[in-house]
């Protein structure tokens, strides 16, 4: 508000926390989904959820483990077929104690997660995975499974839309892009969405999802930025992401932005945010992310050489300088200088 006042003049800030479609928060343990909060508790973490997690960590329950041992889950079948290798560990021999402790819990494969969501009437869903390779890997997991989320009529309708959307792309290019497998995935009701895809492919996925023909999308966080693709449910597999330098926790702002895709206005009465539990994940931490509504905004604006040259070419030096001085980054920098000056003055008077 203060920044806008300096740029535009007198500004009145109006704060609204009303959400057109209410959002329910959930955690998934094995094949079960538990409410994150106690009903009508004002934000108290679900005691039953905490008890289940404690039992799971102590090895007193087989939630998420029985299917893995018996070979029912998709990841279990992949492990048995692959000679003892799993997605999370190497060969069975020589593993550390920490790795053996994680055997108490095995996350469901992506197809199994979608089946659980389907049984709870939580589709369509967007699963956020913080890498392009992870999104493609999730898609191939579903392809290798027997999962189908569409009827025969819907599958044919999807194929017709896809074929019309790629008309004009040479056949040899489609072969390089693995078009047939991508088309099959769409016809079965699931897709990947990330910036590494051909723009035409991304637009087709967005169109089919908005039409309700594709029921599951595995996407990077770029889908939460400016693309109108709301879903009934948003799934977060992890609460950490790689920021280019290190793996860091999601901030409340990022969590709110991602889960903000849940709940379609005029269609759903409730949206769902589902976090998949993993060892060492504290439900109170998740509750903190879900309940935080105010968080600092920090500008990431950083002028570069190309921007400077373009501004000078279009506006000249004086006008370019005035424009940059109006930026939120400059406003925050000025504020920090004022605060540091006050600190120095207070220190001098001591």
Q: For each predicted feature, which ranges?
A:
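Conserved ATPase-coupling elements of RecA-like P-loop NTPase cores
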Residues: 1, 201, 227-230, 245
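Ser/Thr-glycine-rich phosphate-binding loops at phosphate-binding pockets of nucleotides
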Residues: 1, 212, 218-223
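Conserved interdomain linker/interface between the two RecA-like ATPase lobes of SF2 helicase motors
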Residues: 1-141, 191, 277-281
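Conserved segment of the helicase C-terminal RecA-like domain
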Residues: 24-25, 216, 222, 229-294
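Conserved C-terminal RecA-like helicase domain
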Residues: 69-97, 105, 111, 132-216, ...
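Active-site glycine-centered loops adjacent to acidic/histidine catalytic or metal-binding residues
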Residues: 131, 190, 226, 260
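Long, largely alpha-helical accessory region at the distal end of helicase-like NTP-driven motors
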Residues: 281-350
């Amino acid at each position: 508000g203060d920044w806008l006042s300096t740029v535009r003049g007198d500004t009145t800030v109006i704060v609204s926390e009303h959400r057109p479609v209410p959002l329910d928060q959930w955690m998934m343990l094995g094949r079960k989904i538990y409410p994150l909060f106690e009903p009508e508790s004002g934000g108290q973490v679900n005691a039953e959820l905490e008890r289940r997690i404690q039992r799971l960590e102590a090895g007193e329950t087989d939630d998420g483990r029985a299917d893995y041992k018996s070979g029912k889950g998709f990841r279990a079948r992949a492990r048995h077929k692959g000679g003892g290798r799993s997605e999370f560990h190497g060969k069975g021999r020589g593993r550390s104690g920490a790795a053996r402790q994680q055997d108490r819990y095995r996350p469901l494969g992506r197809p199994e997660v979608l089946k659980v969501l389907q049984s709870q009437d939580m589709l369509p869903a967007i699963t956020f995975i913080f890498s392009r390779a992870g999104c493609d890997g999730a898609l191939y997991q579903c392809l290798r499974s027997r999962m189908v989320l569409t009827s025969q009529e819907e599958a044919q309708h999807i194929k017709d839309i896809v074929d019309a959307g790629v008309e004009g792309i040479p056949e040899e290019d489609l072969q390089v892009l693995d078009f047939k497998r991508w088309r099959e995935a769409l016809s079965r009701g699931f897709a990947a969405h990330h910036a590494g895809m051909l723009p035409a492919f991304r637009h087709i996925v967005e169109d089919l999802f908005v039409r309700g023909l594709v029921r599951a999308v595995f996407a990077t966080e770029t889908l939460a930025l400016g693309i109108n693709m709301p879903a009934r449910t948003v799934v977060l597999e992890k609460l950490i992401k790689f920021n280019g330098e290190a793996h860091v926790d999601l901030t409340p702002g990022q969590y709110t932005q991602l889960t903000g895709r849940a709940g379609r206005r005029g269609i759903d009465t409730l949206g769902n945010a589902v976090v998949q539990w993993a060892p060492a994940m504290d439900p109170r931490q998740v509750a903190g992310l879900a309940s935080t509504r105010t968080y600092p905004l920090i500008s990431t604006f950083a002028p570069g050489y190309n921007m400077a040259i373009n501004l000078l070419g279009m506006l000249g030096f004086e006008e370019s300088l005035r424009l940059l001085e109006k930026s939120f980054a400059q406003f925050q920098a000025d504020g920090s200088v004022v605060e540091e000056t006050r600190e120095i003055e207070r220190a001098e008077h001591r």
